Each structure stands twice: as C-alpha cells, then as structure tokens.
Amino acid sequence: MAGHSKWANTKHRKAAQDAKRGKIFTKVIRELVTAAKLGGGDAGSNPRLRAAMDKALANNMTRDTMNRAIARGVGGDDDSNMETIIYEGYGPGGTAVMVECLSDNRNRTVSEVRHAFTKTGGNLGTDGSVAYLFTKKGVISYAPGLDEDAVMDAALEAGADDVMTYDDGAIDVFTAWENMGAVKDVLDAAGLQADSAEVTMIPSTKADMDAETAPKLLRLIDMLEDCDDVQEVYHNGEISDEVAETL
C-alpha cells in the first residue's frame, strides 16, 4: 500500500510531547505494572506486557526501571486496583475519539475526560458510539531512509498483515496486535531498526481537519494526555501538510 506520510501530522507536536516525558514515564510504568500483574512477567506469552515494554524502550526508559516495574506487578507489590476503561466521544470537526484510561476511580476519570471534550467543543459519547470505526492493530514504524522492498519482504515473511509506504520514504508495518512483538523480533534480526512499535487503534475512515478545527483537535488531545489517568488517545482526524504548517 502507498499513502501520505503521517510524519508531517506529528512532527509539530514533538516538542510538546518531549516536555511531557516525565508524565509519559509515569504512565508507561503504570501500564507495565498492570500488564505484568494481569498476565505475568513473560513478555513472550503476555502481548500486552510486550507492547508496554516496546513503548518503554521507545521512550528511552532504562531496562532497570522497566524490570523493576514488571517485578512490582508480578510480585503483587502494587496494591492499587487499576482497571482499564475506554471512553468514546466526538471531537472538533466531527472526529471520532477513543480514550484509553487506567484508573482506580471511575468518577474522577470520567469527570476529567468529559471536561476536556466540553472545553474543546466536543462531547463524550456512549459505549460503542465510535468504537466500530477502529480496529486494534500493532504498528511498527520506520523512519525514511530504509530500503522499502527489504522491509516489505521481511515484514510479510514474518507474518505482518500489511505494509504501508509513504511519499517521504517512511514505512509502517501493520500486524495483529498480539503478534507485534514476534514480527518486530524478526525485523530486528534482519537488521531493520524500528523508530517505534506500538499497539494502536486504526480508524477505518478519516475526518479532514481545516485551519479552524485542527488546533481544537490538538488542544483536545493535549488536555486528555494531561490527565493522569489517560494512557492513550486515538482519533480519526487527518491534518494535511498545508494545515500543519500553519499550526
């Protein structure tokens, strides 16, 4: 598959994301502890843990910090009763938004999530209101510069579902979310260094953002990501290069 690069849509947010590094670490540690607590400390048989480990390493977390978090979960040293909660809603410009949370207090979490939607002109929906528009997938991303044919051949041989190449040479490899770790291992062994690997929700349709709605969508995402209980924000908003340059 060929397509338009997502890199332009994300690069203008990198500085803000870097500023949130400390908060990201806290959230990744929480996910590591929870994944290990629920599914055990073996990443080979616990795809949720493997995905959390890949995210931790992508954010430059040390293996020592990561292993301590896993040990906390496996050893039962963490006495919090965290549960995964998914909220669905509509953002600026009719965007479909899914918010994945880890929380020990539903009332606090839903209040913060609803506030973010309301402040940016969106609204929190009911269960199932937008979930049907998304599919859970593993995505292994490669920065421009690699041999596209080499990545594609290795990915498909490793059992990937699909490979998308972009105009600027960036490449995304899509997998069943449970198989992402195994596919990445094969690609790593082939000498193909990924820029990132994550489990995400892929939208089946896109909502084009213009110069008016794009800033509102980005504000919604930032407000949600600032909530301590929010782990991930997924949406189907599409920001063109032209609009991104104005932000």
Curated annotation (Swiss-Prot):
Principal location class: cytoplasm
SUPFAM superfamilies in UniProt: YebC-like
Compartments it resides in: Cytoplasm
Xref: InterPro entries: Integrase-like_N, TACO1_YebC-like_2nd/3rd_dom, TACO1_YebC_N, Transcrip_reg_TACO1-like, Transcrip_reg_TACO1-like_dom3, YebC-like
Protein name: Probable transcriptional regulatory protein ETA_14870
Signal peptide positions (record): none
Pfam families in the cross-refs: TACO1_YebC_N, Transcrip_reg
Superkingdom, taxonomy of origin: Bacteria
Gene Ontology BP terms: regulation of DNA-templated transcription
GO MF annotations in UniProt: DNA binding
UniProt keywords, alphabetically: Cytoplasm, DNA-binding, Transcription, Transcription regulation
Region of interest (Disordered), residue spans: 1-20
Isomerase recorded as keyword: no
PANTHER family with a match to the protein in the record: TRANSCRIPTIONAL REGULATORY PROTEIN YEBC-RELATED, TRANSLATIONAL ACTIVATOR OF CYTOCHROME C OXIDASE 1
A Gene Ontology cellular-component term: cytosol
Family: Belongs to the TACO1 family.
